[in-house]
Amino acid sequence: MSTKDIFFNPIWDVRMTDTSLRDGSHHKRHQFTKDEVGAIVAALDTAGVPVIEVTHGDGLGGSSFNYGFSKTPEQELIKLAAETAKEAKIAFLMLPGVGTKEDIKEAQNNGGSICRIATHCTEADVSIQHFGLARELGLETVGFLMMSHTIPPEKLAQQARIMADAGCQCVYVVDSAGALVLEGVRDRVAALVAELGSDAQVGFHGHENLGLGVANSVEAVRAGAKQIDGSCRRFGAGAGNAPVEALIGVFDKIGVKTGIDFFDIADAAEEVVAPAMPAECLLDRNALIMGYSGVYSSFLKHAIRQSERYGVPAHQLLHRAGQRKLIGGQEDQLIDIALEIKREQDSGATAAH
């Protein structure tokens, strides 16, 4: 697989993707309106953001009882985003088993041009047919190895090779839990760069659950990553993603070219993205527990809901989810954990953590 047909301006050192309208969907409980999406896409496009991701938080087909229903159908939002953007490319996420091949085709028909396919970091093989279809359709392809903190660099590189051989043009180290710390990112990105060579680029997607989203992204770039994700105003799951406006400020200072104007992206974050957020993404106890315990960031809202439903502490739910090594798609097990803690409370046996 060649990287020559990847959308990449030669003046860039890295290509930025803003995922406010996908990862941010978790924080907003998938309640984006067309007006919000149109305004955010226009502001990001004006600032020079080259790629904007738009989908339900859990990807194509994610609007469901298990993950939460979308206020506006995601395909309508993809179409609106593609019609609004003048320069930026519109990306969409899909998880095999949640989205389908038909969803990919519909997203392309609606103007999406970059297909990002996500699997758990040990299950790259389930993405093979989807990458094949995406390349047949002429879509650019990106692979997400989620929860990358859970396996060592050499095993992650083996999974990246599966994606690249299937047609993936850039494989991401995805720190879904915000649990990786500096050298953990560097070692994983370097392992993927060494394995993939010129066959595919390497990317990094970070979360702020330990406050390291920006620093980890810098480590990724220094280790050879060519694509970096972030969200304006940290608009994402958990404590949010690495804030794009901060990333651009830091990259400007260390000489990493992105093509994004710092002042324009700061304006977009403050004046357009922030008003669309239900609240700021906080580095609070719940978020810290997720980073510390290695919990998938989108579990936060689900844990809060079960906490309120069963009268048990959300941070205890999240800590036990980490102990059980739950992954994306197992959100329903938070109910079992809540009932377990409730029984312990009733018997007076609940531990402090």
Swiss-Prot record:
Pfam families: DmpG_comm, HMGL-like. The record marks R22 as: Transition state stabilizer. Its EC number is 4.1.3.39. Keywords: Aromatic hydrocarbons catabolism, Lyase, Manganese, Metal-binding. One of its GO terms (molecular function) is 4-hydroxy-2-oxovalerate aldolase activity. Substrate binds at R22, D23, S176, H205, Y296. Mn(2+) binds at D23, H205, H207. Residues 14-266 form the Pyruvate carboxyltransferase domain. CDD domains: DRE_TIM_HOA. It catalyses: (S)-4-hydroxy-2-oxopentanoate = acetaldehyde + pyruvate. One of its GO terms (biological process) is L-leucine biosynthetic process. The active site is at H26 (proton acceptor). It comes from the Bacteria. Belongs to the 4-hydroxy-2-oxovalerate aldolase family. NCBIfam families: 4OH_2_O_val_ald, PRK08195.1. This is 4-hydroxy-2-oxovalerate aldolase 2. It comes from Mycobacterium sp. (strain JLS).
